[in-house]
Amino acid sequence: MELKKLMGHISIIPDYRQAWKMEHKLSDILLLTICAVISGAEGWEDIEDFGETHPDFLKQYGDFENGIPVHDTIARVVSCISPAKFHECFINWMRDCHSSDDKDVIAIDGKTLRHSYDKSRRRGAIHVISAFSTMHSLVIGQIKTDEKSNEITAIPELLNMLDIKGKIITTDAMGCQKDIAEKIQKQGGDYLFAVKGNQGRLNKAFEEKFPLKELNNPAHDSYAMSEKSHGREEIRLHIVCDVPDELIDFTFEWKGLKKLCVAVSFRSIIAEQKKELEMTVRYYISSADLTAEKFATAIRNHWHVENKLHWRLDVVMNEDDCKIRRGNAAELFSGIRHIAINILTNDKVFKAGLRRKMRKAAMDRNYLASVLTGSGLS
């Protein structure tokens, strides 16, 4: 993930400024912004401060002929960048430097940038849908929608940008749509969709096929696992079966449908010497030839997008508190955070969490340089 490759892809982003007004190169402004965010910057002034503190370092990678741009210039330029071109560069960069395994599970999930709404301009908060390689903990693509409800139309657009051949694509119930299933199959991938009330007939078929007695004593391929932590004990039972004859009609509606899958969670909460038992049942459909154990691994991997991406964005990078909203800036800044997470995640030399890596990058130029040049990265 060398910086040189990234900047090569970024160089195709068009700069719409009038040439005679350009005091700072677009590539320099983006280079500064990316380095600053890797080092913990959360806003425009933070980025300017980073630049003023590290001018000699930045000149090793960019021109900065007229010095470091002020925060107003950074904000104005970044907010005018085409999000479509930026996302294209991001995806091409990831394709160039990251080879995904055919066994990878790609989790597609959305996240609302809570403070990106602009009341004065009557603009709602934006919703960013990310494609996350659970095997490598890397963001491999992203696209913006104006509302969560628009995920249904945005997911196919995101899939168009990705190479998903041989991969399993997971989504929540919002993404459980026949058109999306067909698209994934046409692109050579497999799907694993959560099923809820938005697919009424399918959900009812599951309830009839898997009554409580079946869940307690499954007749199909099953796999159980248990976990104890924080005064809580959880047993997860996973059941997988072929589509039975009485439900064969669903295979004509859902392209490639092979398996019906059920995940049952029995959770015991130990409080004041009493055990409270909770049971949760979740249904899934899949075109992949899954065993119960592989199904358990796939849905567990799907939740990596929450704790290895969304949690990091909110807790470590304070994304939910970010009030950047000028022009296209909120969407662009979200993408730059993804770049920073990918670069730092791939550093295998310094064994530490994201927050500590960001602090080290801010304090240690040698470490920042090693991260940017890709030395020691897998």
Swiss-Prot record:
Q: Which GO terms describe its molecular function?
A: DNA binding; transposase activity
Superkingdom assignment: Bacteria
**GO terms of biological process kind:** DNA transposition
Tell me what organism the protein belongs to.
Answer: Escherichia coli (strain K12)
- Name of this chain's protein: H repeat-associated putative transposase YdcC
To which protein family does this belong?
A: Belongs to the transposase 11 family.
